[in-house]
Amino acid sequence: LRNYVLSLANTGVRHGTEALGLRWRNIEWYLRDGERYLAVSVDGKTNKRTAIARDRVVDFLWRQALLNPSIWALDFDELIAAELDEAVFTTRLSAPVTVHNLNRTFNALLDELGLKTGADGRTRTLYSWRHFYATQDLERGVSTHALSKQMGNSTVMLDKHYSKYSPLLNAEVHSGRKKKH
């Protein structure tokens, strides 16, 4: 659950179909101007797209790979280069995890921690990590256009859900105290 949640929170990928459909062959290194970025190709609700993962996702995916005995012999770069058709999110027995088990485990954890609802009174779900991702990017000043491409949403949908947060998330920019990059 840990690696799954952290991956959701740092890619903007949808819980369920997109994340659980992810295979090692869908992950690759993207090189640009001498820099290496982790690219994740997903087939989702709207269409196929490639998302750039935050750098720390490498650690979460490597930790996930170490849970799968069928790929232990490979280091991370070898694993990516091998383009395996193996599911990324598996149990320790190499079986793909299910939405039902993830939801059940996540809900039990939230209950145990007393975190079932957010400050806004809404029930938290694994999909909440997608909202977390979007909010974090908007706070960093990422445009709704760029974010829509990353997340596979329309700018209209992003504006509908997040426009009320934008002035608050970027108060230092709107106040003139800090320039947007």
Where are the regions that the model predicts?
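C-terminal catalytic core of Y-nucleophile DNA break-rejoin enzymes
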Residues: V42-L66, A81-A108, T125
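Active-site-proximal segment of tyrosine recombinases
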Residues: E18-L20, R124-T125, A134, G141-N153
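Short alpha-helical segment immediately N-terminal to, or the first helix within
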Residues: S7-L8, Q136-R140, Q150, H161
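Key DNA-contact positions within bacterial/archaeal DNA-binding proteins
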Residues: T17, H100, V156
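Short basic/aromatic active-site micro-motif
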Residues: L1-R2, A95, V99-N103, T117-R140
